[in-house]
Amino acid sequence: MPFRDAEYSAIAKMPISGLVRIGWLGLEGDAVADRVHHGGWDKAIHLYPQDHYPFWRERKPGHALLDQAGAFGENIASSGLTESEICIGDRFTLGSAVLEVSHGRQPCWKLDHRFGAKDVMATIVKTARCGIYFRVAQEGEADASVDTHMALIDRPQPEWPVARVFRLLIGGGHKGDPAAVRELAAMPLLAEAWRERAAKLAG
């Protein structure tokens, strides 16, 4: 999808069916246009909770993008798994693959552009409805044609839900809890980019 000034984005995702290969860098056939800011080991899979869609429909009534999953560029559309309930380092099975939570998604201007609005990115920052990135801990396959269940198999850091980390590192909360930010800077299970961000915020 072409964006401004000849930039390209692969944010536009469509529902798929059938058996899908899940490799180290994501779903087989998934396009990543901006490899500097998207994709890679820590951003292999993006989940955006379907639980948030009613919130967005209230704010963007009649917007066609919200008629189906994929509006936020997510690879996985889930219900019952939100940023407040999923923690850094959580491991889930998806088909025969194992996914590990690496960090939340830091929103960028492309979401505003996609929705034709100026407030989507700011609303995500304010509400922590950011979505979740996973790294692939074990390659495998999942059948997108059926209601595939993501099963939690490990939770090493229950005190670190994605929403809390997002508010500290992206939402401005670092000013009120510098000790937590220093802890994040040294957290091996947190994505490298967010560890680096935490280190800068900690000074």
Locations of the language-model features?
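Loop/turn positions that initiate beta-strands
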Residues: G89, E141-T148
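Short beta-strand-turn/beta-hairpin segments enriched in glycine/proline and small hydrophobics
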Residues: R114-K126
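Electropositive, beta-rich accessory/interaction domains or terminal extensions
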Residues: M1-D112, D119, D154-G203
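Short hydrophobic beta/alpha edge segments that flank linear recognition/processing sites
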Residues: T148-D154
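Residue "hotspots" at secondary-structure boundaries inside conserved domains
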Residues: S84, E139-A142
